[in-house]
Amino acid sequence: MDYSFLLIILLLTISTSCCAAPSSYVEEQLRDRISNLPGQPSNVDFRQYSGYVTVHEERGRALFYWLVESPLARDPKSRPLVLWLNGGPGCSSVAYGAAEEIGPFRVGSDGKTLHSKLYAWNKLANLLFLESPAGVGFSYSNTTSDLYTTGDQRTAEDSYIFLVNWFERFPQYKHREFYIVGESYAGHFVPQLSKLVHERNKGFKNPAINLKGFMVGNAVTDDYHDYIGTFEYWWNHGLISDSTYHQLKTACYSVSSQHPSMQCMVALRNAELEQGNIDPYSIFTKPCNSTVALKRFLKGRYPWMSRAYDPCTERYSNVYFNRLDVQKALHANVTRLSYPWKACSDIVGSYWDDSPLSMLPIYKELITAGLKIWVFSGDTDAVVPITATRYSVDALKLATITNWYPWYDHGKVGGWSQVYKGLTLVTVAGAGHEVPLHRPRQAFILFRSFLESKPMPMT
């Protein structure tokens, strides 16, 4: 590769968006530049970067990122920056967000070939995928106890430190329009990180991290309303019996998702048995197998605290990202971790520490602050279903601007939407827990509408 040419390009890019940058920034970007991913298509016309950003020197915590810029023909310098986070907690944004949902490539069944996605979101924005917290994916800590003591608070703080340091490495993105997007348990991560950025931007007229808003999908939001909505969805869709429904309502409403009572765990186990061999993340989709997703579905804790959707494509990602040539191309696993790369960390998820009962106070604060907030939901997800999301949104008591209406894609209903003062709610018909995986075109329309601050199309 002609690194002198890359150096010139990077210098020109940085100089157009900020004053002269020290050469160390350019050197760091050159170090992180992905020249070519094994198996990628030949017609890739966008820049990619990946590597590590240290968030705690003393304990040796470093988070792995993957930046996928917009195609050169779409002028990436004019496009916003979007941080994507997956949930779990303990699941990888590389495994799900990048490889299965919104990234430019999907991994082929041979675990070797990358295929281009027609509705990749980097056509609309520069995408930054972060594996967080330490212990997830390629992100690591040199202090083993960190993997057993992490929780919401540390995850938010480390993610914020990551952003501060990352923007120093990529100063051309400073002051750029910036959004945070995620799904599932990122329903905690996204608003919590947004709150931190908003608070620490106070006093700056032109903050480097120019946060404009956030969007979450099938998001864990409020324990009480998530319980009500989830159990109601199970019962309304014929997934559980009347007696188990009443048992769940009696045993589970008054406890937290982190510390369920024995009675609640019994009720959840009964619900799991009654649901049988279905894919709870997409109830009308044939499950890939009867092992991984189902064994982790309830697992003695609440369903929305488990891992993300487990289609067969995850198997291909596990093969691909554990290849040494792939890790070398991504500048990943530089410390030679003692465990293989996995889509979700059992340790991080099982030993999760703090998890507040509700994100609604953060919503109220950031709505008042004027941030753009969108919430979307695939309507065939039984893990964090649309009913749970609607109960949580209703609890905010927001004034309605545009009442519930069907939105359209080429004359067909793509879902439904309601616009509130300070928040937009969108459903995607036929989509499961991972909306962009099941309905990529409709998810693309949703993302475009969000970025453009336009309501979902009515015709």
From Swiss-Prot:
Keywords: Carboxypeptidase, Disulfide bond, Glycoprotein, Hydrolase, Protease, Secreted, Signal. GO terms for biological process: proteolysis. SUPFAM superfamilies: alpha/beta-Hydrolases. Glycans are attached at residues 142, 289, 333. GO terms for molecular function: serine-type carboxypeptidase activity. Residues 1-20 form the signal peptide. It is an enzyme of class 3 (hydrolase). The keyword Iron-sulfur does not apply. GO terms for cellular component: extracellular region. It holds the Pfam family Peptidase_S10. Its main location: secreted. It is found in: Secreted. Disulfide bonds join 91-344, 252-264, 288-312. Ubiquitous. The active site is at 184, 381, 433. InterPro entries: AB_hydrolase_fold, Peptidase_S10, Ser_caboxypep_his_AS, Ser_caboxypep_ser_AS. Its EC number is 3.4.16.-. Belongs to the peptidase S10 family. Probable carboxypeptidase. This is Serine carboxypeptidase-like 27. It comes from Arabidopsis thaliana. The gene is SCPL27.
